[in-house]
Each structure stands twice: as C-alpha cells, then as structure tokens.
C-alpha cells in the first residue's frame, strides 16, 4: 500500500534529520524563533453561514503526480491569504508530494493566518520541527497511529502551543480520535490506502462526533452547493488543495467558493 511506502520513506528521512540536527539542538533554535502559534480554533470555528477554507499549497500527489508545474509556494500562499483563506496547508513531504519544510518557513515569514504542517507525522521531533518552521497546527493521521501514539502526539503538540488536525476515514479512526482527545477532526473523503473516494462520509460520521469538536471536510471539494450541504451537516471548515492547484488563478477559485 502507498501509505506504507510513504511511512517507511518518512522514517528513513527522519532518522537522517535527527542525526544532522539532534532533538536538543532543534529545541534550542526556538530561542531565535520570532513566531508564536496563532489561534487555530478561532480561525476554523464556523460562525453562522461563513465558509472557512484551509487552502493547500501542493505541487504533487502519489495518485496524480505533478499537479502544478509552475509552482511558486509563496505566491500561491499570498494569493490565498489575499482572497480570505482561513488558514493555509503546506505539504512538507518531499518524495511523494514534492513538499518541503522550507516552503513552510518561507510562507510563515510573509503571511499572518494559521499554517498547517501537512505531513506523515508519527514522532515528537516532527511536531517540534513544525513549530520551529512556523506551523500553528499539524496533521495527525489516525490510520497511521495507535490510540496511545495519537494521544501522546496530541498532548505534545498542545504542550508546545500547537493544535492538531486529526484525520479520519472510518468509524475506527473516529473512535481513536475521540478517545485520544482530538479537538479538530478532519473527515477525509479519500481512502489513503487505495485512493477511492466516498463523498457520503461526512453524512455517515458527523452524527457520531460530539458537538464540541471542530469538523473539517477534506478531498474532492470543488462545488459551492456541496460545501453548503456539508455545512448544514455540521462541517466547520474545508481543506481544499488539488482543485485550486489545477486552476490558473487559485485565489479566484478560492474566492468563488466563499
């Protein structure tokens, strides 16, 4: 499965990064970090009919290959911010998504809205990295982690002042997210194991989610009417990437959905 391949490659990369920059040295670099985590909950919590979008900076994906040839991460991020994105998701996985932590750092220096580090995170080191490079929240994929691991990473993120978006795809993932104490739950319509889509997933899972949680819908979102339908089900915000990346003007495409 592709998820296993990504996970293994991420583990190899992480081992190398830890050798180059040990945990304590990474932590010390926070002393010169001028950025403090922003209020992610406030940014994503829906207010009445307001449409909140986490717009994604994404060059490629394992299923589609390169999505955006003329890829300028900072220009894309600034266009998103100008067109009222609630937050920006930055892919930092280099092999399958052509992302980079440097993109995150660059975007942080020139934007004011919350940033999500989107990667395959399973180690506290990666969460500390996210903070050092300017993220305000991190992606944790429930499918990749045991409940104990998920809980530990959630608690560590909060200890650093970061939030976590816990991504789920089925009832088992949801149980894990709730019992681990997730505040922000992302329902991914795409199954990461085989890339099939189930656009009815929010309808199936939202009734099982406590009202206190912030709910994010992910994948396959490109229609304003469908976004309104999901809002009526209880979705707070939407994570959209590929649709914007295929448009000539990603900012204009974003604005059209608001």
Curated annotation (Swiss-Prot):
- Pathway noted in the entry: Amino-acid biosynthesis; L-tryptophan biosynthesis; L-tryptophan from chorismate: step 4/5
Reaction catalyzed:
1-(2-carboxyphenylamino)-1-deoxy-D-ribulose 5-phosphate + H(+) = (1S,2R)-1-C-(indol-3-yl)glycerol 3-phosphate + CO2 + H2O
What CDD domains does the record point to?
IGPS
Annotated Gene Ontology MF terms? Answer: indole-3-glycerol-phosphate synthase activity; phosphoribosylanthranilate isomerase activity
Domain of life where this protein originates: Bacteria
Give the protein family: Belongs to the TrpC family.
Choose any GO biological process term that the UniProt entry carries and state it: L-tryptophan biosynthetic process
Instruction: Tell me which EC number(s) this protein carries.
Output: 4.1.1.48
Q: Which InterPro entries match?
A: Aldolase_TIM, Indole-3-glycerol_P_synth, Indole-3-glycerol_P_synth_dom, Indole-3-GlycerolPSynthase_CS, RibuloseP-bd_barrel
Query: What name does this protein carry?
Result: Indole-3-glycerol phosphate synthase
Q: Which UniProt keywords apply?
A: Amino-acid biosynthesis, Aromatic amino acid biosynthesis, Decarboxylase, Lyase, Tryptophan biosynthesis
């Amino acid at each position: 499965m592709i998820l296993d391949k990504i996970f293994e490659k991420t583990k190899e990369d992480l081992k190398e990064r830890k050798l180059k920059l040990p945990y304590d040295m990474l932590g010390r670099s926070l002393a010169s970090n001028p950025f403090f985590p922003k209020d992610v909950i406030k940014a994503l919590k829906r207010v009445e009919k307001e449409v909140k979008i986490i717009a994604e900076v994404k060059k490629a994906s394992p299923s589609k290959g390169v999505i955006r040839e003329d890829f300028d991460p900072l220009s894309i991020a600034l266009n998103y911010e100008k067109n009222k994105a609630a937050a920006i998701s930055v892919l930092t996985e280099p092999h399958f998504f052509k992302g980079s932590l440097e993109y995150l750092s660059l975007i942080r220096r020139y934007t004011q809205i919350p940033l999500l580090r989107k990667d395959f995170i399973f180690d506290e080191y990666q969460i500390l990295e996210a903070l050092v490079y300017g993220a305000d929240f991190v992606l944790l994929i429930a499918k990749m982690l045991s409940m104990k691991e998920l809980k530990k990473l959630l608690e560590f993120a909060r200890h650093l002042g970061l939030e976590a978006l816990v991504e789920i795809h089925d009832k088992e993932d949801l149980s894990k997210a709730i019992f681990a104490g997730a505040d922000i739950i992302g329902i991914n319509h795409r199954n990461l194991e085989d890339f099939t889509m189930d656009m009815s997933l929010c309808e199936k899972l939202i009734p099982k989610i406590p009202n206190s949680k912030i709910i994010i819908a992910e994948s396959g979102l490109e229609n304003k009417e469908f976004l309104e339908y999901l809002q009526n089900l209880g979705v707070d915000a939407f994570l959209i990437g590929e649709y914007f990346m295929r448009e000539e003007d990603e900012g204009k495409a974003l604005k059209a959905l608001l």
